[in-house]
Amino acid sequence: MTSLSVNDRKDFVDGQMKYWRQIAESDGFDIDDVPVPRGTRAGLWSVDCKHPRFRLRACLPKIYAMVGLHRYNLLRGTNFEHLELLKYNESMNCVCSYYITSVAVDLSSQLQKTFQIRVDEKSFGDLDLTVSVARPNDEEKVTTEKRFIHHFHCEAAADDFYKGALPDWPSVGDLNNQKRFYMVKKCELQSNDWIRLYLELAVGVRYQQTSESDLSKLQVLKVAIETKEEDVQPPNRRLKSKSLHVYITFKGLAKAPIGDEIGEHVERKAIVRRVIDERSGHLTLLGGFSNAKNDLNQSSDDEQPFGKRRRI
């Protein structure tokens, strides 16, 4: 292997510093005219979604854009819905950061806006990510006075109840405690479409090449919401909690993310934790799958009363 001369090494370092300085000027979003220096192995790939040959083969960029809008709506009380992807930049790693530019429409006014959304993955193949930027592109930008880090580097600050590994799937005794859990009614699923979004996200992250056609087969069967706050009134107000655990029973996935049962008819279980840090605005989502046998709508007097659950 030929080693670089002193001058070559200096040119390489200078080129990298200039490259990342230009990236930082737009927070990683508008880099169409920024050339990638030769030898770069940890830069950003740019994808033009409006190019005639562009085809969205994997669903993650679109789902990430939708999650970013979800974060914006939660914090601002708005009702923007994803319309189309314009472009996105993706870090050159297995565990990626995405800088997405997309168009969304406000369902209440039909106003369209262009959004910039940043999603940082923390692990590969499992749902563990943070949305740190979700803003209309005409709003004030993050300035370069703040150091630009192009990969995962922070997450939403969480209460102890929402830290650590995901909880076990709740037992029947757990679910009988209505001070802690809320069973979502079927009529509430449409107005809380973020529940399905979280399920699609968990599946899409586990199976990176999942298509929109694959996701359309998923059917949400039952949902339970858990929050730290006890005796919330009315009970369905838990759906608006900034931090929560959501337990989803579903079918429509032929593969087995956990266990060995194959087929779209098989009922499967997903758990997703949501934490929103209102101070920083960060949204962190952590998710996984369970092969617990108990059902969400079972009821029995033989189960142990609700208490602290073992965490995995």
From Swiss-Prot:
The cross-references to InterPro entries, in alphabetical order and at most eight, read: MS5
> According to its UniProt record, which protein family does this protein belong to?
Belongs to the UPF0725 (EMB2204) family.
Name of this protein: UPF0725 protein At3g19520
Domain of life of the organism in this record? Eukaryota
Q: What is the lineage of its organism?
A: Eukaryota, Viridiplantae, Streptophyta, Embryophyta, Tracheophyta
**Classification via Pfam families:** protein_MS5
* Disulfide bonds, paired cysteine numbers: none
